[in-house]
């Protein structure tokens, strides 16, 4: 059994919304391989759940996969702020953030 297989057997399943976002990222954005995926997303969610921050600052949103993964782990009333320098991703990000 590979390390990836072991990890995938012991972490939360990827939700339908995040899976759809990852797929849409691959289809619509240049450099889709830069997107965080299931393993990275679950790690970020777990870290946020352990630390329980009231505010998170993310620099580099890209497709928003990591952003939404961290948001899943935030406590009630917490905030996440994210910045992306590539303005061509803005419409894509708004679509997915507003739908979340």
Question: Which sequence ranges carry the predicted segments?
Answer:
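A short alpha-helical cap/connector motif
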Residues: 1-100
């Amino acid at each position: 059994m590979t390390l990836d297989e072991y990890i995938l057997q012991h972490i939360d399943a990827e939700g339908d919304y995040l899976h759809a976002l990852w797929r849409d990222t691959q289809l619509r954005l240049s450099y889709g391989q830069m997107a965080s995926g299931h393993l990275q997303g679950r790690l970020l969610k777990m870290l946020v759940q352990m630390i329980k921050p009231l505010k998170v600052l993310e620099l580099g949103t890209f497709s928003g996969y990591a952003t939404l993964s961290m948001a899943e782990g935030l406590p009630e009333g917490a905030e996440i702020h994210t910045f992306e320098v590539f303005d061509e991703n803005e419409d894509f990000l708004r679509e997915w953030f507003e739908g979340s």
